């Protein structure tokens, strides 16, 4: 199977600031200096920041994306915008899938906010085909080890393995 291109074919919503759309803002972004980690890993981390902020404020992630894009340093890249917009567009379905795969004594609201956002990103990547399920899970687990609680990496690994099984079962 040929490798997927680095960008996705997910159509972008037109999000506007007072005078420019997110797409226009992103296109004006200068090349950033190389930093540690892959481009996709950095995009996931930045998307996590934006989704986490929106979840914390109980606001629309598109508003946070617009603010981060207009005032960003370092700039928001198209891949980050794709992740945020993709998760936002499918969030209700993603959250239902997470809830179905959680143990009976857990709820979506009980999950640490970082874990919830990481799970949403990984599931969107699995559903959209922008990353293989293995890569999406591995990246979510790696970010959980770095940014969340002690047990989060194991928790997310188990949850996302269950989600992966469900998604593969739906394809057959």
Name the predicted role of every residue range.
Residues 1-172:
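N-terminal interaction/assembly modules
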């Amino acid at each position: 199977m040929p490798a997927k291109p680095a960008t996705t074919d997910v159509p972008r919503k037109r999000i506007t600031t007072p005078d420019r759309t997110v797409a226009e803002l992103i296109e004006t972004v200068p090349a950033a200096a190389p930093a540690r980690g892959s481009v996709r890993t950095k995009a996931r981390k930045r998307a996590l920041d934006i989704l986490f902020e929106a979840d914390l404020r109980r606001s629309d992630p598109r508003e946070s994306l617009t603010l981060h894009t207009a005032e960003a340093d370092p700039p928001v890249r198209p891949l980050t915008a794709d992740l945020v917009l993709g998760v936002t567009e499918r969030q209700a379905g993603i959250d239902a899938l997470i809830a179905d795969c959680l143990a009976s004594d857990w709820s979506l609201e009980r999950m640490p906010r970082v874990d919830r956002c990481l799970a949403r990103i990984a599931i969107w990547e699995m559903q959209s085909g922008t990353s293989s399920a293995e890569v999406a899970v591995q990246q979510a687990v790696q970010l959980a080890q770095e940014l969340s609680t002690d047990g989060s990496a194991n928790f997310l690994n188990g949850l996302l393995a269950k989600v992966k099984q469900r998604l593969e079962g739906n394809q057959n």
